[in-house]
Structure formats: C-alpha cells, structure tokens
C-alpha cells in the first residue's frame, strides 16, 4: 500500500503509481509530495546538500511488518523536469517514484555497475514511460 501525503495544491491520482508499485514490491511505502522549500530542507539535513532536488528516498530498517521507507518528491522540480523533457507532470512523478522506489529496494546508481539503470529501463519499457532519470542525468 502507498500511504500518500500530498502537501501541495497539485492534484495527483495515486492510482497512477500502482503499476510501478505492484511490479516491484508488496511492502508499504510512504509517499510525500511537497515543494522545493521542504525538499531543500530535507536534502540539507540528511545529505548536506543545500539545494532543492527532485526526489529523496529514506529506507527503513528491514524489520518484519515495517514499511519499506519513504519517498519525497518535489512538485516544483517535477514540473520543471516535465517541461524540460516534454512530458506530463504525472509522468514525471511516476518516473521519480520509480527512481525513489528502486533506491528503497537497495539499488544505487552512484555505486553499482549499472544494475539500477538496467532495472529502471526495464520498468520504463514495460510501462511505456518517458526516459529514465539516470539516462537523462548522464547526458
């Protein structure tokens, strides 16, 4: 189950994430949709980066019955990404959710040998989503 906390005025149908969620996990996940100001504070506090970002993931310890973790997405940055790459804001949120969920599942594109990129591309092709974050950020 996805526990959705929308802290913005943007109306997003959480059911648009069910296909990604069902392909990757059956664990509970918290999803927070926020703005650049709040995500900047979190990024500074937890990653020592004093800037807004698109998505943050906070995994929880692997304990039976516990949620997998939390994903925080900035709607402000998602809107910019959607405009820059020519797709809908909803598709950008789906991409960010996929990226964040893969991090919760233990993937790390900064340290792995392409496993996260391959998994992200596999899901993107299966669900006919726009280009992945990893591929976009490598250009």
UniProtKB/Swiss-Prot annotation:
It comes from Nautilia profundicola (strain ATCC BAA-1463 / DSM 18972 / AmH). Keywords: Cytoplasm, Endonuclease, Hydrolase, Metal-binding, Nuclease, Ribosome biogenesis, rRNA processing, Zinc. It holds the Pfam family YbeY. It is an enzyme of class 3 (hydrolase). Belongs to the endoribonuclease YbeY family. It is found in: Cytoplasm. Its EC number is 3.1.-.-. GO terms for biological process: rRNA processing. Zn(2+) binds at residues 99, 103, 109. Its main location: cytoplasm. This is Endoribonuclease YbeY. Binds 1 zinc ion. The lineage of its organism: Bacteria, Pseudomonadati, Campylobacterota, Epsilonproteobacteria, Nautiliales. Single strand-specific metallo-endoribonuclease involved in late-stage 70S ribosome quality control and in maturation of the 3' terminus of the 16S rRNA. GO terms for molecular function: metalloendopeptidase activity; RNA endonuclease activity; zinc ion binding. Its cofactor is Zn(2+). InterPro entries: MetalPrtase_cat_dom_sf_prd (IPR023091), YbeY (IPR002036), YbeY_CS (IPR020549). GO terms for cellular component: cytoplasm. Signal peptide: none annotated.
């Amino acid at each position: 189950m996805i526990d959705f906390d929308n802290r913005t005025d943007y109306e997003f149908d959480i059911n648009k994430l069910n296909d990604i969620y069902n392909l990757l996990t059956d664990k509970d996940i918290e999803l927070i949709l926020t703005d650049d100001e709040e995500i900047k504070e979190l990024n500074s506090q937890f990653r020592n980066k004093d800037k807004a970002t698109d998505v943050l993931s906070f995994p929880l310890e692997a304990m039976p019955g516990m949620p997998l973790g939390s994903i925080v997405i900035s709607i402000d940055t998602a809107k910019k990404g959607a405009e820059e790459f020519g797709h809908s804001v909803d598709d950008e949120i789906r991409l960010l959710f996929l990226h964040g969920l893969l991090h919760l599942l233990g993937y790390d594109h900064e340290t792995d040998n392409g496993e996260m990129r391959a998994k992200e591309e596999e899901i993107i092709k299966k669900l006919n989503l726009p280009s992945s974050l990893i591929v976009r950020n490598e250009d």
